[in-house]
Amino acid sequence: MADWLLYYTDPVYDAAFSLVTESPLLLSHDSDVRILFQLWLNLTVLGAILYLAGASVNFYFFFDQETLKHPKMLKNQVRREIYLSLESLPYTAIVTVPWFYFELKGYSKLYDTLDSWWEIPGAMLGFFLFTDCLVYWIHRGFHHPSVYWWLHKPHHTWKVCTPYSALAFHWLDGYGQSCPAHLYVYLFPMWKPLYMVSFVALQLWSISIHDGIYISNDEILLSCAHHTIHHLEFNYNFGQYTTLWDRIGGSYKKPVQEFANEMYFDKLKRKKEALLHGKVDGGDVGGKQKTGPIATTISAVAAEGMKARRGF
């Protein structure tokens, strides 16, 4: 994948560098200085584009805007989330570059030619099972008191999340939880286009589990409902895609009944039925709308978490 990042952006860098220097360190495609700089800037810019595009589409088209009125929502939270995310990306890119550099030098097991389409499901399953396991233990490790306060606590500033919360963390936190995805292709063979798709899917999944849209209350799939509990109660649901490792590690907590009543498609159905009867969810048409259902649900979970911590 690193070779694609360089090949398709080489003309842009050639034109830019030729305007300011004649040094072969920046003009030669074989120069390590040029390669490292180009990889770093590409990762920073593409990471920002993917984050802003994915989170913005989710925020403006799917996210329940009533959640912004929740009392646990911080002042200017969305702006602060975006700022922290974009501030962290260049630093995350610096420590991520070596993975791509050594891939370029032939140390990874990525390959260009697909021999059989049957390779795809096996590789995808392996990738997601591998990363699900390692991300769980890395994430749980970041909750250890020795590192939590400076490394992972910035991400838990957001008790009530928005899609922009997905990458709003300390740069080393983001890097640590991305390492399993990079490590996988150094241990197991994978087709380059599939790796790229899987990597993008991983980023979009991270956005989806912070968006407050409860599509699933499944016992196996770890959804936004599970991750909302993690942000509110801290010591549960560390997993990324499934509840498997939370169950093994004794940190699984099933979403409370309020979540089951707020599944996304059920809400759409109820809202449609309400509109047919001249009402909208949360208040009469044209009237003053009440607190949104997601905000109400979050309040219920927060209250339950407080009771649990106090021993009630």
Language model region names:
Residues M1-F37, Y60-L74, P145-F312:
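Cytosolic/stromal cytosol-facing helical appendages immediately following the last transmembrane segment
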Residues G54-F63, T96-L104, V135-H143, V185, ...:
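Membrane-water interface at transmembrane helix exits
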